[in-house]
Structure formats: C-alpha cells, structure tokens
C-alpha cells in the first residue's frame, strides 16, 4: 500500500524518547507523510510513549497564525461536523513532527474519532476499530480514495489504489483470480531464488573481508539490500523481468524513486502548478519527473507487448490449473494477457503494473527493514526464530509447504506491521452524507459528516491503542497467539485467532478491525498473502545464514515517513556467519 498526503512542507523535529518523554531536534518534512518526515527511532523494548487518556498539559494561548487558522476552520467547516471533538491544528503542532505522531497524541486526548481543524479545511481522524469497520467494510462503497487518488493518478493512472469505484470493480474482478494457490506456490521459489542471490552476495563480501583483513564481520545497509531484493521479486513475479538489482544498479529503480519523490513534492503545495503544461518543461524537477516516468513506461510497454505477442487466450479456470512449477512465464502479466473475456487495454495494464511495482516494492522493503531493527534489540527472539528455521528448513531453501510451518517468522512479520504499519494512514472521502458511529467511549448517536469529507483512518493509532492492545508499544510477536476478550467494549468482538480458521496471518477479521496490516473490506490489499509470504521467506533465509546486529544504537536510527516508514540513513547492520 502507498500512503496519501497533502499540504505544505515545513520544518519538523527528529524525536527521541528519554524516560517516556518526547524530545525534538530539526529536519524537513511534509505534513501528511509522503514527503520525508524524520524522527529518531523508538527502542520498542526499553521505552514507549507514556499512555494518557486525557491531556495533562495546560492549555496555552496560540500565536496569531494558530488562532487565525482555528477561527477560519470553525467558521468555514466546524459547524458541518457538529459536536465532534476538535483537535485544533496549530501550526506548531502540525509541522513540529510527523503527522501520525501528532494524531496519536490527539487520539489519547480526544478519543477514537475527532476533527482535525486546519485553516479552511477539517479532516475526520478515526482511531477506533468499530468506526474503521463501518467505513472500510460495512459502507465501503460510500467512500473513495479522495486526495490519495488525486496525487497518485499521474503515476498510477487508474490502477487499483487510486482508481474510482467503477474502474476498481472491473480491475479487481480481473486481477483477483491471478493470485491463486498454484501461482503463490510457484512464487515461493521466486522469493527463495532472489533471496539466495542476496545471501550469496553477502557471503562473498564476508570471504573478501576475511581474506583482506582476517575479520569475519561486514557492515551492510540492509534497507538498500532489501529494496533491491523487493524490486527483483516484483520484476520476476509480476512482469517476468529480471531487474538484477541485487547484483547491479538499475536505472528503473532510480526512476521509481524519482516518481515517488515527485508525488511527495506535490503533497507540499497548495497550488498545483504542475497541471499547467508549460511547467513540464520549464521546471527542472518536472522535466526529471517526465523523464523518470518515460523510463518506467517504456519498460512496462515493452513487457506488455512481448506478452501480447505470445498470447495464448484461455479461460480463467484453465489458467489457474496450469503447471506453474514448470511454466517458463508464471507472471501476473502473463495471466492477465492470456485471460479470455477480458478487454486487454494497454493503458489499463500499464496502470495495474505500475501500481503493483511501486506498492509491492515499497511495502516489502520497509517491513524487512524494521524486522531487522526490532529483532536486533531482542536477541532472545532471534534465537527463537533461528531455532524454528533450523527445525523446519535445516540448511535447505523454503518451499510453499515449509513456509507455512514457519509460524513464528510469520508472527514476527505481522508484529512488525503492527508497530510500523505500511502506510500509517488510510485515506477516504465521503461520496454522500454519512453518519459515523461514535465508537468506544464516543457519542451514542454518532456523528453526521457531509459529502466530500476527507477521512484519515490512522492505522498507527489502531495498532498502538491502549484500549485494544496490551503493552501496545512492545515488540511481542507471541501476542497474536492469545485470545483477547472485548472487555465490555460494546460493538467490538475482541481478538480471536479461531475466527478465521486456516488464515495465513492474523487479519482484520481475527482482530475485528483493530489490526489492519493490509487494510480491510472490499478494497483490502489484493496482494496481502503474496507480501506476507515474500517477507517470511526473505527473513527466514537471512537469519538461516547470518547473525545480525545494528551497527550503532537503536536511538541513532532516524525514521523517515514517506510512502512508507523507512530509515533516513539506511539500516546499517553487522553481518557474520551464524555461530551454531
């Protein structure tokens, strides 16, 4: 998934935690998360944000700019949201640190639904699973992606993430059959083969280090390695194209990051100057964006044409029964091109592929990065993970069946997604007047919201809510094995792993929407099982061969919130062969 964002860039302050208190330093960021926002990381095992149900800070008088912003909001949009609690978006609060951290503070003060007032605009922020379920599942087609679609459309076109409802229904119906069981089974070998290249590269570097200096430890930016790995996997599994970025530099990945950065930039301006055609050639960054987009589009267009030239049209059922273990081209592109009864439109295929390229690449690289970060601070959990790896895999590569037995590794992946959700916010906009439920401790009659209201579902808040999680800031993969009662919370069914028998991972059904690692409802991420399996295989193969620790302290790792949450200066780690 890719997060949405909007509004001006400003100064933010990298944060670190001392004794549960938040302290600040300075860098640059954009308000809503696409443009880099930097904070120093949290040592999840030793420190956490102190939980408060109401603000204990005395109210202070805002400056002139703050007060003007609040008055303007109340005049123009405050009345339309009735008595909903209001978090007044002072300039200092909104631009002083990444938005999702401010949203968490206001959630603890105002509850599971509140209005974020900012200038002439007001946003509804949801941090309650009861309300999230209402929006994402029970009334899913009363909302579209709003500002997310506006920003991503120049890049992803009518792909699944930014698509309007009518287009989304058509494309979802076409793409969903491609993620069938035999395809996923075949992809485990792709995950394994690509991960093996990363492993062999690291082993070669260790041998060279031993030869040159006698040392058996190397230092690697694992975030960069995971980024290359994720690109190679997406290339082979979606396009049947080998980027080879684990072993060489890829111009395509540079272009991908260039397009993402432009999306970040567009979130920082009130005035969309890029919509004026001359800006494409006058403004240097817009010229670069057009160049990056052309590189990616040329690559995708070539792949689409190659696939169509060898098209073997057949029914969906027969496509799903192909021998994917021996198929030369088992990619999603091949499936979509060969599917009978589907109008093959090059532009729509390009949009679908671009969406999968960017969303799939970003999410996996971020999950693996933060998995290493959290595990490196918990050596006992590394030992437990390696014991499972040894028992299930031995020295061999994962298969589909053995991957399913790596239960603890999968729990690590989902716990990483709980603490570092990708993205931290889901964006929706009402298509008609709606009445949102009040949620836990909220108004019984709920809240009326008008058509066109922008809604932020804070996945970060849901995943760290003290009302629905025990020790919400701690890294505890084992938590997903336990049942949690609703504890009298009306409208929430609690956490019960048996609610979704056979599920590959704890999902929104098991947690009744308190856990949304891949969203929920009809517009849930279509590649959830793919992403979980990919991360499980890569993580297992890394710790099968190596012992890993951070190069510096956890506090030295700075967090950047862009399309996903990643490390500002990479995730530098020390690797050496496992000592058994």
Curated annotation (Swiss-Prot):
Q: Which family does it belong to?
A: Belongs to the cytochrome P450 family.
Q: Which cofactor does it need?
A: heme
Binding-site positions, heme: 525
GO terms for cellular component: chloroplast; chloroplast envelope; chloroplast membrane; chloroplast stroma; cytosol
Major place of residence: plastid
Q: Can you say where in the cell this protein is located?
A: Plastid, Chloroplast membrane
**Molecular function (Gene Ontology), one example:** oxidoreductase activity, acting on paired donors, with incorporation or reduction of molecular oxygen
Keyword Metal-binding carried by entry: yes
Q: What is this protein called?
A: Cytochrome P450 97B3, chloroplastic
